[in-house]
């Protein structure tokens, strides 16, 4: 009789575990090393190849872009990690990480292009008008519309 009860209880446990959905837990933070390497590779590509960013700020040589990308990613990872708390589910930290990378990348290319622009400005005069928001008088447009009377 004890064997029958044991077999029935074991069957019940087996059925319960089969009926329960498999719960898989994953953590979004911290990112795996593979993910971090992918971020670095994408940064290198963004910094060293022609893009919208490079049209405005120029490109970096491959070796400089590689070093800069690693530094940007490490600093962003450290900054995001310092904001982490047990209450966060990871998505907020990942957003901080992403924003830090973007901010640092822009700051890097801006600071790199500023000295180049300054030395370039010393060698030749600026081709832009003093206030680019105002229409150019050279084009003959003043921005004003005058009325014209016509005869019927």
UniProtKB/Swiss-Prot annotation:
Principal location: nucleus
Disordered as annotated region, ranges: 1-33, 107-152
Gene Ontology biological-process entries: lateral root development; mitotic cell cycle
Composition skew (Polar residues), residue ranges: 134-152
Tissue: Expressed in young tomato leaves, young fruits, and flowers (at protein level).
Keywords assigned by UniProt, alphabetized: Cytoplasm, Golgi apparatus, Nucleus
Domain of life assignment: Eukaryota
Location of region: WPP: 12-115
Localization per Swiss-Prot or TrEMBL: Nucleus envelope; Cytoplasm; Golgi apparatus; Nucleus
Annotated GO CC locations: Golgi apparatus; nuclear envelope; nuclear matrix
InterPro entries: WPP1/2/3, WPP_dom, WPP_sf
Entry keyword Glycosyltransferase: no
Domain notes: The WPP domain is required for the nuclear envelope localization.
Subunit details: Interacts with WAP through its WPP domain. Binds to MFP1 and FPP proteins.
Protein name: MFP1 attachment factor 1
Annotated organism of origin: Solanum lycopersicum
């Amino acid at each position: 009789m004890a064997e029958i009860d044991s077999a029935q209880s074991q069957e019940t446990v087996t059925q319960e575990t089969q009926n329960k959905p498999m719960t898989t837990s994953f953590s979004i933070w911290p990112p795996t090393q593979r993910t971090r390497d992918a971020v670095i590779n994408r940064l290198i590509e963004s910094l060293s190849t022609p893009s919208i960013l490079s049209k405005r700020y120029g490109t970096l040589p491959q070796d400089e872009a590689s070093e800069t990308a690693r530094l940007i990613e490490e600093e962003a990872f450290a900054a995001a990690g310092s904001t982490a708390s047990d209450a966060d589910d990871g998505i907020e930290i990942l957003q901080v990480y992403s924003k830090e990378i973007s901010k640092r990348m822009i700051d890097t290319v801006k600071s790199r292009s500023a000295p180049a622009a300054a030395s370039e400005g010393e060698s030749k005069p600026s081709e832009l008008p003093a206030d680019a928001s105002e229409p150019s008088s050279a084009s003959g447009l003043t921005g004003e519309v005058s009325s014209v009377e016509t005869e019927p």
